[in-house]
Amino acid sequence: MKIKLMLLTMFWCCTSLFGQDYFPENSGVKSKNNNYTAFTNAKIFITPTQVVEQGTLLIQDGKVVQVGTSVTIPKNSVTIDLDGKSIYPSFIDIYSDFGVSKPKRAEGGGRSPQYDATREGFYWNDHIMPENNAISKFKYDDKKAKELRDAGFGVVNSHIQDGIARGTGVLIALNGKADDSKRVIDDKSGHYFSFSRSVASRQSYPTSLMGAMALLRQMYTDADWYAKGNITTKDRSLEALNANKGMVQIIAAGDKGNVLRADGIGDKNGIQYTILGGGDEYETISDIMSTNAKLILPLNFPDAYDVSNPYQALYVSLEDMRHWNQAPANPKILAENGVTFSFTLNGLKSPAKLKGNLQKAITYGLSKTKALEALTTIPAQTLGKANSIGSLQTGRYANFLITSGDIFDKGTTLYENWVQGSKNVINDKDQRDIRGDYDLMAGSESFKLSITGEPGKPKAEVKKDTNKLKSKLTYKDAWMNLSFTQNEKLYRMTGLVKGNTNTIKGRLLLPDGSESSFKATQTKAYTEKEKGKKEAEKPEIVAVTYPNIGYGYSSIPKSEDMLFKNATVWTSEDAGILENTDVLVKGGKISKIGQNLKAGSAKVIDATGKHLTAGVIDEHSHLAALAVNEAGHNSTAEVKMEDVVDPEDIDIYRNLAGGVTSMQLLHGSANPIGGRSAILKLKWGESAQNMIYSNSPKFIKFALGENVKQSNWQSFSRFPQTRMGVEQVFMSYFQRAKEYEVKKKSGKPYRNDEEMETLVEILNGERYISCHSYVQSEINMLMKVADHFGFKVNTFTHILEGYKVADKMAEHGVGGSTFSDWWAYKYEVKDAIPYNAAIMQSQGVTVAINSDDAEMSRRLNQEAAKTIKYGGVSELDAWKMVTINPAKLLHINERVGSIKEGKDADLVLWSDNPLSIYAKAEKTVIEGATYFDLEIDKQQREAIKNERNKLITMMLKEKEGGGKTQAPKNKKKEKFHCNSL
């Protein structure tokens, strides 16, 4: 009875399972083949680290049933003998746009930017689209799917690659024999982000990287606010953002710096992003490791530059030459340092290029096991799908590759790519390998035939005696077609390759049109020994420096104790200038100032006949920035210059050579209320974060005049358009900030607004204003606005009409940071005079000389000297204008700006009076570490020449060996100013 019940139960189970296939069919008798298929005698990579020899893989219904060396094969199974062949899990691309069309670029443009969103019921910014779902835009692409399968891929994770918040992805099996009901593994497989605007919207904000970062921060804050039910309206974007939080969060960074930026945003919001990198992570490996993020790595290694023309070769920077040489080692370095990563085809022009670049990465030291993990188990784990894809363990999809051998070897042929149990033939595995050397009889004539290349894509070389003849060979479905030309006469032949015989026979069409026969007899089997030796040669990789460009250091400079002996010391303090004086540096601080000091273990520097000063400080700079303006709104107090510090800007090194040790990196003047400043120490070789002053005073850039009212922008749609309007912008925003603070302090729920938080800091005296200014009426206006709201303007920068209102500035307590002798470069500076600095100082204003220019900043010592000529300022007071005075304006004078015991050892040793045009900075020291040394600089120049020649030789060799090259490009570095966009 029990047996009968069991059989009946099995019958009904089978019937119900069959009945679940509810789509009607009109193609004949409805049937389903549930036979097992067994692949025997293969080397099977169950996972990258679990490999069996002479194993069996048993599959049924698109899934792995059993795998190993002791598999019981059911009766009536289809058995395929794979003796001598290998089985691998099919690859996974975690970052794809397969089947998802690119959005159309928004129409319009012209002179009127779009400041508001175009959508209703969604987030206030069109570039935030978490509600997008790739599945709704997905259409299976058979042609592209075949290209991907031919490269070894069985699954791709696709999404809409547009916008800052991009919505969800879709995980697709590349099963061309099924429909979306089967091949869609997950219709919400991840949540995607980037720093790039949507091409489908013309909404102006954000216009910069720092704006995109600020928008992401505010988006997350708003999502939390929305989730708490504190908003009465419906926002489909924020609803989707909150709904998608449980998915893997993937962000496109694109380079090593943006990897760190993305991770910082994630950390602030409790999110561990998986990050699409750029292939240069090896340059800052310790910082990358500290993120604990999983990376997605493109394999788009750069081609060598064609440097055969020595003059064009000058266009190629040492940085680009190094990256060509070092980039293929990136995966190896990440793997050695414990960074988890997946590979992606993103950035490659064709999937067919994957294998060659994988081989290059392996040649550069990446283990084959790590390479396979990056294509299989790691992307599966990252997506949370390790129980269904990425390996050949029991229960997983039957996604696997059949190869002739090691999948990463050049000579290996990919025969088949099975996806969800469906067979896809790439190359016929039963087709004979015909490579080798042959004696060829074509009619009555004899030739030598050599067949090389890959088994599935062979190449022919035909010779008559020693003459090489133009030839073409195709080989498919066991048919070989060969043609060659001798003395402009064409021979064509076709033959069927049979069994294991060493002879190929067939029909021949002679040049005169008559028909004959041919016979090719193999004399030597093909061997890859010579190629193997060549591939075994390890490439020479040049050393990474910090930063990894010209003039970078082999290691980051370290603080050391030092004693400057017998210097002329410019203290920038009441002590004035001290002759024949010693300065002892210990632990990065100025320890003692005096004569005949004992060095102890400190390094002694003979400064006899030389001048020692505090480091030059530039109150107004735009160097070391990746962006300078966020122009999308008339107030952008939420953006931070600290987000876009570029620690690899060569102008940092050049400024160190000019004695500059600190600077304020200011937002530009595109709007009345700009972004927050970054105060930096020019620690060449350090990360951006390590350059920013610890416990830095808070600053923000304001602006007045032509730029903020868009006088020269040819755009008239943004408020303000007049100087009167500029005042009202300030009044409006500060009033809103007051109201915001009242609500915040009330204890009632409030929406955290980064922009308002910044303005509240100004009202409370916690953040200082550096204001771009020219015209006296506007200077006076902003001081009155500040008085109205009860705060002080800290600094007027540029301030070319400061001499007209110097008494009012002194009364208000605001400083002036000005140019020495700039005028006549635009209309609103028509009243500028070179006596401006001296006049403001005479009225009790703290005056600094600034640059607003990457070139002028390294000559600020000479700019300060001009105040002696124009105004009769003393040498000591002139020098204070580029040392202690800017330090006071930046509220860092307790640490830097003068030579005083206890202050940071930010010092410059000059060859002459620092105000002289003949003076050279011989050593520039920051916190006891030497970041510029004139003698070392000379050595570096010679080393750069030698390294360039070495890399050029490597590139020439690459070209000679048939490697692909790219044309040299003259990349001109952009120099930012206040009005740069």
Spell out what each predicted region is:
Residues 21-31, 35, 44, 48-90, ...:
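Histidine-rich, glycine-flanked metal-binding segment
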Residues 103, 110-123, 131, 298-308, ...:
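His/Asp/Glu-enriched, well-ordered alpha-helical/loop segment
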Residues 25-31, 44-56, 68-69, 352, ...:
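Acidic, glycine-enriched loop/beta-strand segments at the rims
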Residues 95, 441-448, 479-548:
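Beta-sheet ligand-binding and adhesion/scaffold domains
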Residues 140-282, 413, 419, 454, ...:
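Polyanionic/metal-chelating signatures
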Residues 39-42, 429-448, 456-466, 471-473, ...:
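Tryptophan-anchored aromatic micro-motifs
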Residues 54, 159, 232-327, 341-342, ...:
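Active-site core of metal-dependent hydrolases
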